[in-house]
Amino acid sequence: MANTKREKLFAEFPPVPTEKWEEVIAVDLKGADYERKLVWRTPEGFNVRPYYRAENLEGLKFLASEPGEFPYVRGTRCDNVWRVHQSLTVKCPEAANAEALKLLDSGVDSLGFSLTKGLSAAEVETLLRDIHLPAVEVVFSGEGVADVVEPVLAKIEKEGWQETASVHFVLDPIINRLSLTGAFCSPGGEKCFKMLAGLVRRTAAMKGVRVVTVSGENFSNAGSTIVEELAFTLSAGHEYLVRLMDEGLTVDEAARKIRFSMGVTSNYFMEMAKFRAARMLWANIVKGYNPEKGCSCKLFAHAVTSTWNQTVYDPYINMLRGTTEAMSAAIAGVHSLEVTPFNASFAEPDEFSKRIARNVELLLKHESHFDQVVDPAGGSYYIENLTQSIAAEAWKLFLELEEKGGYVAAFESGYVVERVDASAAAKDKSVAQRRITLLGANQYPNFTEVASDAVTEAAVTRRKKAGVLNPYRGAMAFEAMRLHVDRSGKTPKAFMLTAGHLAMARAR
């Protein structure tokens, strides 16, 4: 009979109260200010302690939930299998189909078709030839997305895939149009929401089809904080929810057709906490409308790695950035993930950069087995507290937007852009002062490197259009100076001016 008596392995190590830890820290600080030395004042609006203990979990109500249980902090599913997503631009349906099939053979199971124009029903057939939609997720985006909706839905019905197809459309007039261009998409204004409501009804029997995508990564790439990205994204999602219900849909019908896309920065633990907080907040938002089905409260999350921190100089570092960002998203339990190719900031991604991007995810899956553990961050004193802090601050900002009439009203008043621009300016200052490090740009540059011919002036020039979100990269100011020098063909000269007291300068 097995001995089931549990041994007390740590009996020789009595628990140490927090007061004792604080006493030791005070001695080590030697009189230095505790708050200034050890407490991190985040741009998100809350402080992070130097350490966390079990007592710091007290009062966190969401800790009792399991993966797949409301409020879905630990995930909307009981597994952590995410889809490996990769996008391609559709110029020729025949060529795009060939490339898509090659991607599927390379481990991708989520295809993104970025359309440059609308496609006919015959062209949609060509594009989707030999692609089995019940097994492969397909996302349509770009200028022609509205025109392909009906041909794609007809294809699903023709094949009898209504119950099994996983297809999403990046129809996002609130962010992709209003927030980026300053105007709603054609036909404009309220008609956009009538059109979306019609598509929700049209796809009611297609459980795996989502017609609205809230493109929150645009906030992150425009320089927002993590809290701002989360609050603004949820606010835009709520705006869709309300507008669709105003068109006569139930909360269940509307919520199940909304997909969220968010960026992932190199802020490793905070990004994990952001997605956990996003699921919790969205679940509570939807629950407030008394849905009939609990599954309507689940947030469907896609993640795409950041472009804000990518650099055109020493670009291979972007591979490392993408890897840590992908890890954050995978651990956080997203539904699908796209790693941005390392050269996307200055060139059309080629076969090599695309292969490296998807192999990052495949390595995390098949070698590191990140898909085998559900919510590995759960129970971490630090990450659970980050989740609570991010959720609390994002909820405050969300309520501010609601008081202003919702996301659209807040954006049209200039509030959203003012917030994001202020955060971007603070980041720019930190980059200039090297408080934010961008390797290869403001820290440890490769002095022998000369920009390749693929790097153009446009790639390092920041667009600044008033009244809208302006995605950019944090390294642009440094890169513009370097590119100017590279193109001039002249070696810059610097005059070293001695200033101050000579005796003090020579003191040893």
How should each PLM-predicted stretch be described?
Residues 234-237, 260-357:
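Glycine-rich anion/phosphate-binding loop at the beta-strand->alpha-helix junction
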Residues 200, 204-241, 323-398:
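Mobile "lid/hinge" segments at catalytic clefts and subdomain interfaces of large enzymes
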Residues 224-230, 265-277, 306-319, 347-357, ...:
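Short glycine/threonine-rich loop-to-helix capping motif typified by GTGT followed
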Residues 309, 341-347, 368-382, 473, ...:
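N-terminal glycine-/lysine-enriched basic segments
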Residues 2-267, 271, 289, 298-302, ...:
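Catalytic alpha/beta active-site cores
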Residues 244-252, 286-293, 347, 371-375:
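Inter-helical turn/loop segments and adjacent helix faces that build the functional surface
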Residues 2-22, 39-40, 46-72, 335, ...:
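Intrinsic disorder at enzyme termini
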Residues 45, 107, 160, 282, ...:
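Conserved, mostly hydrophobic/aromatic
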